[in-house]
Amino acid sequence: MSYIFTSESVSEGHPDKICDQISDAILDECLESDPNSRVACETLIKNNTVVVAGEITSNANVDYESVARKVVRDIGYIENDLGFASASFEFQNLISEQSKDIDAGISGDTVLGSGDQGLMFGYACKETPELMPLPIALAHKLMLKHAEVRKTKGLGLRPDAKSQVSIEYDSNYQPKRIDSIVLSTQHSDDLDLEDLREIVKTQIIDSCLPEKLLDNETKYLINPAGRFVIGGPVGDCGLTGRKI
């Protein structure tokens, strides 16, 4: 019996993904100067405000605000007309050192305990060179292409976007065909919806998906809800850990 499996990926400008990247960048900065850093950093974004909170014990001297602004700038939130911009967002720092009680429980000369932070889902497989299941590999590929086209060609695309790819598998658990592709992207106010759909189909989707898995029944759902002008942290709250 065949079945359909769907995976989702979001763009670098999606609110949750912005938060992931800020927390990740802060971790990288801490580890670069102090490999023994202990970092539990959460990020929250809404409207034009970025909040970092958590517990960090490190000898590294990290300017959290500068790190956050660089991440946002590199993503492409630069102009204030989006309602969220790297130079103007309000920044709140609620980071403290790790609790001494937790520190005592995980420190030691020989045996180390572990904190309670973990993230587990999924599996490795041989479906793709990335050793990831095909639906998530293709969904990620679409979002990487979206970022490339947006940054090099513009075309009215904005940073916030999401993709879903549904694959039909045969009874031997092998990918049989692509059942459907959903790609929704934020766009400029002056971009016509049909023009947007043509841009996404020709500039992004067509270059990412294997032709052998496409057929006349494959469904392309591009901005199926219609216009998507208000996006990013103005449209949704973002939080670390929901889109890693």
Residue ranges and their predicted role:
Residues 1-40:
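N-terminal, positively charged regions that mediate nucleic acid binding
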Residues 1-5, 45, 177:
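Flexible hinge/switch segments at interdomain interfaces of large molecular machines
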Residues 6, 66, 73-234:
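Glycine-rich, mobile lid/loop segments that gate access to catalytic sites or pores
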Residues 12, 54, 185:
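Short glycine-centered, acidic/aromatic-flanked micro-motifs in structured strand/loop junctions
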Residues 40-58:
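Short, charge-patterned binding micro-sites
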Residues 55-62, 226-243:
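Short glycine/threonine-rich loop-to-helix capping motif typified by GTGT followed
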Residues 58-72:
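Active-site-surrounding "flap" and adjacent substrate/cofactor-binding loops of secreted or lumenal enzymes
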